[in-house]
């Protein structure tokens, strides 16, 4: 026990080590506070949805006047959907920083609404906003290098190693004990602030333990690299430069090159292209005979084929029908997009076994439900809800049932938990 206490005292007597531990603690706290503030801001925005939707619906309802046309209601009313953050999302913001977490949809063509502004390429975990995942993935290795690069060379350069070898000591155990103390100190400085904030955010105990275990494993990886370099017998300056170069390659260059390789190996149609194709299909419907549009719609949705035929005047059921036909027209593009995104995500996850920084990001965002899979699941919930909206308004339009002001409040409401 005295030997362990001696290692702790010796580490704390080093100004560099003490300053590094203090700085790491401050950065960990700052990253956690930043993540909590960002998620609190999103929760506040989501909490305001109900009141804002009620105001918007009241305005649309007031403008409805004496009309009994459900098509006007379907066209002018927006219906909010939202993707609430998980308790752990403060630690790994992930996709929530680049993908919409609130989406207002109408009972018109959905794919253009979903894919508007979909210009990001988040399939591979790379450097992003400053959060706890960023700290662990990119900054923590630098602190490991700062404390471990001279774990042996410092003794050699001061001549203490020769003296220590003359004593009845096992040098391997001495350096192992020293490395353990330094890694434990780094783990505590990064993990203790996380533990406090995670408990305050009511994160599940299993997730807290998983994050702490993940951080410990990541520390061991970088500590192992440092020990491999230290045992080469180089001086401290060469060790530091070598380890810094390894950090650049493993944490920055490697993931960036892998990202380029994955994008080239698995081409994916951009979401903006899907939105454009859907709009082109919708706009082209104005030049197609209405009977052809309805025939195509009834072939796909036979439950509405008994609807009264169109008259000479404009009818919203034709308008909503060709919007749905537009969605159906781009369904193969959407399926290909989804498949490509999932393949890229799987490739990035597999790459995490070769590049630990990528694996760290993938694991953290997966636990926090802020990864691409969580975003795709939100899109699936939006599609399910949009189908409910369409069925609701179709029930009026395709049976020529009058739509009155109280019917606005009877429209389906989005359930984020479904």
PLM regions with names:
Residues 1-125, 240, 247-418:
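Transmembrane alpha-helical segments and their membrane-interface loop/helix boundaries
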Residues 22, 180, 184, 188, ...:
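Hydrophobic residues within alpha-helical transmembrane segments
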Residues 27, 31, 185, 189, ...:
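Alpha-helical transmembrane segments of multipass membrane proteins
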Residues 127-158:
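Long, hydrophobic alpha-helical segments
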Residues 211-233:
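Hydrophobic alpha-helical transmembrane segments of polytopic membrane proteins
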